[in-house]
Amino acid sequence: MYSNRKECPRRVKSFDSVNSGLDENQINNEFNKSTYIKIEDNKEYSENVCERGKASVIFSLKNEIGGLVKALKLFQEKHVNLIHIESRKSKRRNSEFEIFVDCDSNREQLNEIFQLLKPHVNVISMSPPENFTVQEDDMESVPWFPKKISDLDKCANRVLMYGSDLDADHPGFKDNVYRKRRKYFADVAMSYKYGDPIPHIEFTEEEIQTWGTVFRELNKLYPTHACREYLKNLPLLSKHCGYREDNIPQLEDVSRFLRERTGFTIRPVAGYLSPRDFLAGLAFRVFHCTQYVRHDSDPLNTPEPDTCHELLGHVPLLAEPSFAQFSQEIGLASLGASDEAVQKLATCYFFTVEFGLCKQEGKLKVYGAGLLSSISELKHSLSGNAKVKPFDPMVTCNQECIITSFQELYFVSESFEEAKEKMREFAKTIQRPFGLKYNPFTQSVDILKDTKSIAMVVRELRHELDIVNDALNKMNKQLGV
């Protein structure tokens, strides 16, 4: 538990509130014995002072005489000045009490005390020194990541395949007209910069027919296969963005719609991005979206994500606040993470956002975009023949992702909220020397690597809580409470 003493002075409790197992005289005697804890100035102490600041430590001792003196002696041995000490009854166990200590220390001293206290206490938490910051050496090992939404210009064009570069087994490989069209879409995406309106596309008759076939066949399955959130948002897209069998929606219209619903925006992309670059976009509520249409020789199948997949699979759920938050949090967890961690996050994304199932009213429903844009696999996933397991990020992150055929296994969540909570816990296992907080006002990420930046977040949270408290008070007055 962190406590910023400078921002929130704490009232000292009397020792009368401490568990009766240690009476007032015993506790006062222990404090009298510990008066030597204050460190006198000396040469050794002065030479070891660096980057000092006020820090707070909370530890819980068992009900035994002498335990407090033993613990406080560790501070003396490490030449740490104690500024303030107080006790309080433990909320965890009646047989224990907690000691709160304000001290003047640097990072190294605090780490040493933490290690020394652990064998002797049951609970321990601490806040770092007020002027603590992550060392630059720790930051140098962190992979580059975008700090603000405009930084996506630096990574959105790092596509793995470009324009007319198609694999030999692609349906359009020998179709020069199709390849030329693909290059056109790629050039449009490569020319796009943050803040630009997405160019209006005049789709060909063949492209509209292909879209219409996919749209018509999938809409036959959605009422029985898609989750309720998808079914709620699809009619809104028809109304506001022109989702129709005879019309391919424009990305600019879709982007404006999403911005009003969940804050997500669309950015055109020329092709496949690396997992790191794609997830980075999600951190800023930006979805990289292709505009090209699959080849008309096989409209019900595509070897790669196309605009049918993006607009019919992803967009309806990006218009759902809870799902949008889930997607963004996966993106935020990826920023500055190691390659191994990013791959695990990408795999979890694949088996949730792309191929996820959920339970609604006792039945399995689909929310994964890869399923919602594939007629054959959408049928298969709920046929009863597909293998299904509960979503667990620690397990899911090791599952093989299959692109050329149906998945061997699908993961089911009770709800988006459950999946989000599990991913939050999983994200805590990712090693980074800093924390991150998304700033929706500047569309940037705040890097939390020192006590000053963390204190600022605390102030913001207090303001938000004041607003909530004020609203509750007004409701209580209206209710006569």
Swiss-Prot record:
Pfam families: Biopterin_H (PF00351)
Keyword Metal-binding: yes
Superkingdom in the source lineage: Eukaryota
UniProt keyword annotation of DNA-binding present: no
Entry's transmembrane regions: none
Annotated InterPro entries: ACT-like_dom_sf (IPR045865), ACT_dom (IPR002912), ArAA_hydroxylase (IPR001273), ArAA_hydroxylase_Fe/CU_BS (IPR018301), ArAA_hydroxylase_sf (IPR036951), Aro-AA_hydroxylase_C_sf (IPR036329), Aromatic-AA_hydroxylase_C (IPR019774), Trp_5_mOase (IPR005963)
Cofactor: Fe(2+)
Keywords (A to Z) from UniProt: Iron, Metal-binding, Monooxygenase, Oxidoreductase, Serotonin biosynthesis
EC number of this enzyme: 1.14.16.4
GO process terms (BP): aromatic amino acid metabolic process; platelet degranulation; regulation of hemostasis; serotonin biosynthetic process
Recorded catalytic activity of this chain's protein: (6R)-L-erythro-5,6,7,8-tetrahydrobiopterin + L-tryptophan + O2 = 5-hydroxy-L-tryptophan + (4aS,6R)-4a-hydroxy-L-erythro-5,6,7,8-tetrahydrobiopterin
One GO molecular-function entry: tryptophan 5-monooxygenase activity
Biological function: Oxidizes L-tryptophan to 5-hydroxy-l-tryptophan in the rate-determining step of serotonin biosynthesis.
Assembly description: Homotetramer.
Family statement: Belongs to the biopterin-dependent aromatic amino acid hydroxylase family.
Name of the protein in question: Tryptophan 5-hydroxylase
Species this chain originates from: Xenopus laevis (African clawed frog)
